[in-house]
């Protein structure tokens, strides 16, 4: 069962049977932090929407490849770690098509985190945007069920350009934006995993990534709805 940091704090308070005044003090300290972090989650969704629209409006990716994607992971503003610390880190929403064969409308967003040295090598300046296309049900199930290392648990490749005659059979295609232009980049060695704390904040209950993107009654926030609307209007359903 998924247990978030916020739930662990509440469990600690309950288990230790702390005095009321101390419990109140702890909650007064924790709740504002929880609210601030939730606002950051909403900001991430809003920024992801802008990144997605930037990719969709660019001529850097084949519409056919987009139409074949089972899921999309959008990572806005991935930041490079400071001097002496290898790699980079960031987070963003994963959205998947509905239906057993991943050909339906797009799901509510589940928040994910990403990290690894290979990401840091691709980050231009202080931060960069990335979009990952998950191309088959095998890699989708891998990503939904826990931490996935690209290149080890799933094959990953730089996304082909819009004029490419064909694409490889990689599980994941990756695009990065540098200086306003999207291009295929390699993120082999990077890891992605569900951000359970962020998902708890966004949905106000404990949900796994699978619950969110494969569920039928998950209700996203307004920022999440806006992201779903863009995907459904720009890409829509896959052809059978």
Where are these regions (language model features)?
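N-terminal secretory signal peptides that target proteins for export/translocation
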Residues: 1-15
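Low-complexity, Gly/Pro
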Residues: 12, 32-35
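Hydrophobic alpha-helical segments, especially transmembrane helices
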Residues: 16-17, 77
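Bacterial N-terminal signal peptides
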Residues: 17-30
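Small-residue-enriched, tightly packed secondary-structure blocks
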Residues: 36-240
